[in-house]
Amino acid sequence: MINLILLGLPGAGKGTASEQIVDKYHLAHISTGDMFREAMANKTPVGLEAKSYIDKGDLVPDEVTAKLVEERLGQDDVKNGFILDGFPRTTNQAELLDEITTRLNKQLTNVIAIDVKEETLIDRLSARFMCKNCGATYNKFSKKPKVEGTCDRCGGHEFYQREDDKPEVVKNRLEVNEKMNAPLKEYYDKKGLLATVNGEQVPEKVFADIDAILSKD
């Protein structure tokens, strides 16, 4: 069984790699963003608790997010393994996750960091654009829609660039993320769980390297 966390700065290619891993290994793809939306829509107790913070514009405390993760990891589709997306972001969250996975007997098997140089990430992120309708992500260099001007996923025709994908904002965002990412890598390296792949390569090669790590274990 594979229970996996992918680490990497924005633009490193975690989304693409996650899709490829899920397709091959049939893991549950657990995204904290999706979890929040689902729990709030279903009005679960934890969802309502999270909503009370979000509605006030406050950050959701780690303990509340951890409850949400525990609720999600207890669902049936996780029995073949999971890939966690967006959690943990800090060592405090990593410690909470250790407690959860121990309680549920679903310990992590792999933590894979996708490493990419800062200048490459700035180029990638400032070339990124999204479908206004469904949020599918594209890149004007490496991942254009199959039909120009038409979203592959939903057929929409309107696209936009996020404010935080503009070059002047990207550099600052990367620095903030790196400050959070570095201690996490160290945390999992000390536990002997961390492997690193070169994210400068084409997505197929990045996935081949990840696949080699996952197949080995």
UniProtKB/Swiss-Prot annotation:
Catalyzed chemical reaction(s): AMP + ATP = 2 ADP
UniProt pathway: Purine metabolism; AMP biosynthesis via salvage pathway; AMP from ADP: step 1/1
Annotated localization: Cytoplasm
EC number: 2.7.4.3
Designated name of the protein: Adenylate kinase
Record remark on domains: Consists of three domains, a large central CORE domain and two small peripheral domains, NMPbind and LID, which undergo movements during catalysis. The LID domain closes over the site of phosphoryl transfer upon ATP binding. Assembling and dissambling the active center during each catalytic cycle provides an effective means to prevent ATP hydrolysis. Some bacteria have evolved a zinc-coordinating structure that stabilizes the LID domain.
InterPro entries: Adenyl_kin_sub, Adenylat/UMP-CMP_kin, Adenylat_kinase_CS, Adenylate_kinase_lid-dom, P-loop_NTPase
GO cellular component terms, semicolon-separated: cytoplasm
CDD domains, A to Z: ADK
Top EC category: transferase
Organism this protein belongs to: Lactobacillus delbrueckii subsp. bulgaricus (strain ATCC 11842 / DSM 20081 / BCRC 10696 / JCM 1002 / NBRC 13953 / NCIMB 11778 / NCTC 12712 / WDCM 00102 / Lb 14)
Keywords: ATP-binding, Cytoplasm, Kinase, Metal-binding, Nucleotide biosynthesis, Nucleotide-binding, Transferase, Zinc
Chain residue ranges for the region called LID: 127-165
